[in-house]
Amino acid sequence: MTEKIGLFTGTFDPLTNGHLDIIKRASQHFDQLYVGIFKNDQKNPLFPTDKRVEMLEEALTNLSVTHKVKVIKHERDLTVNIAKKLDVTALVRSLRNSQDLEYEKNMFYFNLEMTGIETLFFLAKPELEPLNSTRMRELHAFGQDVSAWVPENVSRELRKLDEEKK
């Protein structure tokens, strides 16, 4: 039987409780789930890639999936190219709303055409739908406490950023 290998990618800047929920739920469907932290040249990150990897790995220790989940980073490549190198059997994407669906439908088409790799979509739980990294960065930039929506270790790192600015 072929091993089921998934790949869930993002910038995770910062990591949210919504991301963790998708990772936990998706890991139940794979023998191995890679979580790829990728650099996005169109975004100005709060945290460098290595720090985001460190924060995700720490947050995962609180979930019971660390034996199945491996965090990887990549500075510059298409998700589908990484997926081919890792023998991924399915890409993992999350959908919070209709805007996500429209964007992901387009990506689904090209990913499937270029690699033949299917994409599995996980709907965000209703209470996690509003969460996204952009909103967390915006709220944090205006001095708002986002600790209810991000893992504790991420909240701690955001507070450190604030201290460094003083």
Swiss-Prot record:
GO terms for cellular component: cytoplasm. This is Phosphopantetheine adenylyltransferase. It comes from the Bacteria. Homohexamer. InterPro entries: Cyt_trans-like, PPAT, Rossmann-like_a/b/a_fold. Its cofactor is Mg(2+). Its EC number is 2.7.7.3. Keywords: ATP-binding, Coenzyme A biosynthesis, Cytoplasm, Magnesium, Nucleotide-binding, Nucleotidyltransferase, Transferase. It catalyses: (R)-4'-phosphopantetheine + ATP + H(+) = 3'-dephospho-CoA + diphosphate. Pathway: Cofactor biosynthesis; coenzyme A biosynthesis; CoA from (R)-pantothenate: step 4/5. ATP binds at residues 11-12, 19, 104, 128-134. One of its GO terms (biological process) is coenzyme A biosynthetic process. It holds the Pfam family CTP_transf_like. Gene3D superfamilies: HUPs. The record marks 19 as: Transition state stabilizer. It comes from Lactococcus lactis subsp. cremoris (strain SK11). The gene is coaD. The lineage of its organism: Bacteria, Bacillati, Bacillota, Bacilli, Lactobacillales. It is found in: Cytoplasm. Reversibly transfers an adenylyl group from ATP to 4'-phosphopantetheine, yielding dephospho-CoA (dPCoA) and pyrophosphate. Belongs to the bacterial CoaD family. Substrate binds at residues 11, 43, 79, 93. It is an enzyme of class 2 (transferase). GO terms for molecular function: ATP binding; pantetheine-phosphate adenylyltransferase activity.
